[in-house]
Amino acid sequence: MTTSFGAAINIAVADDPNPKLQIHNFSGLKSTSNSLLLSRRLHVFQSFSPSNPSSIVRAVSTPAKPAAVEPKRSKVEIFKEQSNFIRYPLNEEILNDAPNINEAATQLIKFHGSYMQYDRDERGGRSYSFMLRTKNPGGEVPNRLYLVMDDLADQFGIGTLRLTTRQTFQLHGVLKKNLKTVMSTIIKNMGSTLGACGDLNRNVLAPAAPFAKKDYMFAKQTADNIAALLTPQSGFYYDVWVDGEKVMTAEPPEVVKARNDNSHGTNFPDSPEPIYGTQFLPRKFKIAVTVPTDNSVDIFTNDIGVVVVSNEDGEPQGFNIYVGGGMGRTHRMETTFPRLAEPLGYVPKEDILYAVKAIVVTQRENGRRDDRRYSRLKYLLSSWGIEKFRSVTEQYYGKKFQPCRELPEWEFKSYLGWHEAGDGSLFCGLHVDNGRVKGAMKKALREVIEKYNLNVRLTPNQNIILCNIRQAWKRPITTVLAQGGLLQPRYVDPLNLTAMACPAFPLCPLAITEAERGIPDILKRVRAIFERVGLKYSESVVIRITGCPNGCARPYMAELGLVGDGPNSYQIWLGGTPNQTSLAKTFKDKLKVQDLEKVLEPLFFHWRRKRQSKESFGDFTNRMGFEKLGEFVEKWEGIPESSSRYNLKLFADRETYEAMDALASIQDKNAHQLAIEVVRNYVASQQNGKSMD
């Protein structure tokens, strides 16, 4: 199968330093609506002018026959088409004196790793700034880059760094006049923002723990290789931000070979973007790599999930591949939905880059480009089904996928606290509330990272791991971190340890209610409910909050997800599990934040009373069913007086306790509840002048 790409073209080049690609009678990549986009081949080559280091794209094409019906396509597709490979008009807009950029440039700058924002707390004129997002495969951040990002936050941002759910930094509050300085500084200090946003492959996730284990190291190497394979090649990023200066990178030969291979019609021949072409992908594309049991990356929420499969000796042999996950949706549109990835097949380790490329090309050729709400890979999977998707992808792969190998149960792993890496060094995972590095915490991190020359890794749960620590440094590092409020996990409320929120207000343009600023109070209220209904301090529930339905903090995988649905209002989602393998469902369509207790108190009370042994809240809600849960809420009249717990501690020998616990479980109670009943009955009998048998 050969990819085709082209159109009748008029190009203004001559002496124009910013040539504009004008394509008429556009027909394009295949879509699920059966329209054809870019149906004729476009032969593109690059030419360089000594007076202008920026790449100039020239093209020739056979005149095309006008299409009978112009296929519908989104406005963003037109912006991409006319952009000279994501350059124009951004390269002009960043040079003028306006504080903002125009609509086309606003879409294009996403490919460069930035979003234009404004402070929504302010009234009157808009105060524009830009958010920059880095790209760090597997969350790896060299010492030098961390220190530079820390400096840039103070010099050009709002004084904070935001750790994201895709293992990257976000730097907020950069003014347009400072964009080029900030971007070029990141580029020249071992960093990049290229492809952190936009319609292309985003940051590739991998377990952040720097274990010196074969499977973990292989997963990280694979994430790096996939990221390199799918990095844009046309040079637009460096043309805009460092005036075309070449940045030398060393790519493994297997990456170069896989990218250039066109034996199965995956590439655009002679194009500066052999995989993406001028139109790139229909929408964002997310990939994660991990090892068996380690679901720290939320593997099933990605467009592609890749799992290392090893033999009995621990030697990596190949990969299970899962496809079609994604979180984003639109309120009150049932045709949009979150979705879990499903098994595609197994490939030997030497084929992984070709398999990933084949999946990406299948989405490129068939994903919808007319309506961006339905452009993610998950909608193609839902439309086609896995069998058709597998069959089409195999044509680009050139082989049959083998059945997925059986894997053990998944676990969520945070890697907080101190751990041995396995090479003689230690690493320390630090909890950062909502990923916001600021104040004393920021200062403490800077001090230890700079003093001990530490590299770091960012986690998919908005936390940070300090790497390469010698045993002798453990105590002084722990002391400095504690002074900055970075405590060991045993000193942090368990509810906070797994909670996540997106930034939302005041800077996110999509937010419709609070998330990061609202979650501290919500967690305190949940903790208070726990205390009222008798849940232990050590018990927890995975809580995730977003300010809109796009799902950046992955609320649809939470045991309790709050999804912004209006000012101070949320949808309530229930049914995710602690190991992130089940999709939550909508329990309440709209709930004012002040009414949270009316819903959560009866749910947590009945969870404590009716749960099975070690049953999580998510598993409990799934077992009960939403109809029964709705009854709990509707009939709730408050915590029964008999369930109130006063400061009474009971002690028993082990044999008595175990017998009591076994008896209590039969009666759907815990040992303490049964003991209280025994005491209550004894007291009542004494008051009535009766003796106990």
UniProtKB/Swiss-Prot annotation:
GO terms for biological process: negative regulation of DNA-templated transcription; sulfate assimilation; sulfide oxidation. Its cofactor is siroheme; [4Fe-4S] cluster. Expressed in leaves, stems, roots and petals. The keyword tRNA-binding does not apply. It is found in: Plastid, Chloroplast stroma, Chloroplast nucleoid; Plastid, Chloroplast stroma; Plastid stroma. Signal peptide: none annotated. Phosphorylated; this phosphorylation reduces DNA-binding. Its EC number is 1.8.7.1. Keywords: 4Fe-4S, Chloroplast, DNA-binding, Heme, Iron, Iron-sulfur, Metal-binding, Oxidoreductase, Plastid, Thioether bond, Transit peptide. [4Fe-4S] cluster binds at residues 502, 508, 548, 552. It catalyses: hydrogen sulfide + 6 oxidized [2Fe-2S]-[ferredoxin] + 3 H2O = sulfite + 6 reduced [2Fe-2S]-[ferredoxin] + 7 H(+). One of its GO terms (cellular component) is chloroplast stroma. The keyword Acetylation does not apply. It holds the Pfam family NIR_SIR_ferr. One of its GO terms (molecular function) is heme binding. InterPro entries: NiRdtase/SiRdtase_haem-b_fer (IPR005117), Nit/Sulf_reduc_fer-like_dom_sf (IPR036136), NO2/SO3_Rdtase_4Fe4S_dom (IPR006067), NO2/SO3_Rdtase_4Fe4S_prot (IPR045169), NO2/SO3_Rdtase_4Fe4S_sf (IPR045854), NO2/SO3_Rdtase_FeS/sirohaem_BS (IPR006066), SiR_ferredoxin-dep (IPR011787). Its main location: plastid. Residues 1-62 form a transit peptide. Binds 1 siroheme per subunit. Binds 1 [4Fe-4S] cluster per subunit. PANTHER family: SULFITE REDUCTASE [NADPH] SUBUNIT BETA, SULFITE REDUCTASE [NADPH] SUBUNIT BETA-RELATED. Essential protein with sulfite reductase activity required in assimilatory sulfate reduction pathway during both primary and secondary metabolism and thus involved in development and growth. Monomer. Interacts with ferredoxin. Belongs to the nitrite and sulfite reductase 4Fe-4S domain family. This is Sulfite reductase 1 [ferredoxin], chloroplastic. The lineage of its organism: Eukaryota, Viridiplantae, Streptophyta, Embryophyta, Tracheophyta.
